[in-house]
Amino acid sequence: TVASQVDAAFEVLILTHGFSPVPSELRARARSLGVESLQLLTAEPGVPLGECLNLLVRASSGDVVAKMDDDDLYGPRYLSDQLHAMDYSGADVVGKQAHYMYLKGLDATILRFPEREHRYTDFVAGPTIMARRELAIGIPFPATSRGEDTAFLRNAAAAGATLYAADRFNFVQVRSDGGIAHTWDVTSSELLANSRVEFFGRNQGHIFW
């Protein structure tokens, strides 16, 4: 997903949590996919997720950092779309509030919060957080493993940062039977009750452009 990004210059930072892969294999794989800049970090199992994110932010070299979840799907223009939103909104943090979600157990794609796009906000979905690096350095993620995204957004807004919800496209959150990224307790029935079914299957051609 990262390697498929177009119209955006980027470096990839990967942090493995509690295990150490073979760097040469990862670098070879990255090169085969066209990724020119790759940094590999590791953290012990006891390091909270929020602190892992801070390690990645501090190791980055760009002006903007983007958090991407390997469980979810990102279209090839995801990064450029987010960067454009940051540019025209002037926001310090951008992301998706209106977004598609694929429910694996039902093979259905739903749309959540369709009215919450193209607007300034106080919340965006964690896997879509893109922030100015200077802000993420000054207001780090809390050293917790649950709620770190929400706390970061809340602290950023309290410090005067501007948050903007971009359009719904180029991102699909994937919900397996075990939950979203293994941190949500919400059920598929609850998600369906507060969303609308757009289509069965993934139909990424409608979402990615």
Question: Where on the chain are the PLM-derived regions?
Answer:
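C-terminal catalytic/acceptor-binding lobe
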Residues: 138-209
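Short beta-strand/loop segment that forms part of the nucleotide-sugar
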Residues: 9-21, 39-43
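Conserved donor NDP-sugar-binding/catalytic core segment of glycosyltransferases
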Residues: 77-108
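The conserved acidic donor/metal-binding loop of glycosyltransferases
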Residues: 69-73
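Glycine-rich, basic loop-to-helix element that forms the pyrophosphate-binding segment
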Residues: 43-60
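Short aromatic/hydrophobic "clamp" motif used to bind/position activated sugar donors
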Residues: 65
